[in-house]
A protein has these predicted regions:
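Short hydrophobic segments within beta-strands
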Residues: 64-66, 105, 129, 151
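Conserved AMP-binding/adenylate-forming
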Residues: 73, 90-133
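N-lobe entry segment of adenylate-forming
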Residues: 1-75, 79-86, 180-187
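A generic secondary-structure signal
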Residues: 51-52, 86, 90-94, 140-144, ...
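Asparagine-rich low-complexity intrinsically disordered tracts
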Residues: 70-71, 92-93, 97, 174, ...
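Structural core segment of the AMP-binding/adenylate-forming
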Residues: 117-194
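Short, intrinsically disordered, charge-balanced linker/junction segments flanking boundaries
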Residues: 195-200
Length: 200
């Protein structure tokens, strides 16, 4: 192994916030396969958000998002960090444990990004489902993944069509709605919109 190559990747590893620094920097394997930092552990939220705040970029914009109504949402790193922390706290309050499995049902929205980064922040395994998936396709994934919680942007009509029977069959699954219109169902947790979404 070329020492120069290893030193190059060792230097690049300093860019990353590690929970556990890797000892294996760059490994060449059979059939021209390579691995980088294979024994290191990191958290994506720490590297996407915390690192930028620590580098004095907290007042810089992290996300520009345009919704279907052409409303523009611009959020700075510090604001985004607060939203992620608030949603992380919400997930903890509904008794999710470390290593919980989460299904996030939603389009490429701002709330979906918050949900993903909150799950990463807490160490929850998560999978994102497209909003357009049919009820049958969602059921297959629920049976396969066996999530502890489903997070969705579904409003009442879509909830009744896609999720009502799933929750009836899987009584242990929690359901969180961050719909603009409240979903009427005893099993649904509502998001405090003041703490979560800041559309400007």
């Amino acid at each position: 192994m070329d020492v120069e190559v290893k030193n190059f990747w060792k230097e690049k590893s300093n860019i990353i916030n590690w929970k556990r620094k890797p000892k294996k920097i760059f490994t060449e394997k059979k059939n021209n396969k390579f691995t980088w930092y294979e024994d290191g552990i990191l958290n994506i939220k720490s590297n996407c958000i915390d690192k930028n705040i620590n580098d004095n970029l907290g007042e810089k914009y992290a996300i520009h998002y345009i919704d279907k109504q052409k409303n523009i949402l611009s959020v700075k790193y510090k604001e985004l960090n607060n939203l992620i922390n608030n949603f992380s706290l919400f997930l903890k309050k509904i008794n999710l444990k470390k290593n919980s499995k989460v299904l996030i049902h939603g389009s490429s929205s701002f709330e979906t990004s918050i949900s993903m980064l909150s799950c990463a922040n807490l160490g929850y395994s998560h999978c994102v489902l497209f909003q357009e998936l049919s009820k049958e396709a969602i059921e297959v994934r629920v049976d396969l993944i066996k999530p502890d919680i489903i997070i969705s942007r579904s409003e009442q009509k879509e909830f009744d069509l896609k999720f009502k029977s799933i929750l009836r069959k899987n009584k242990k699954i929690k359901f969180v709605s961050f719909s603009n219109k409240p979903v009427k169902n005893k099993k649904v947790f509502k998001i405090n919109k003041n703490n979560f979404t800041k559309f400007k």
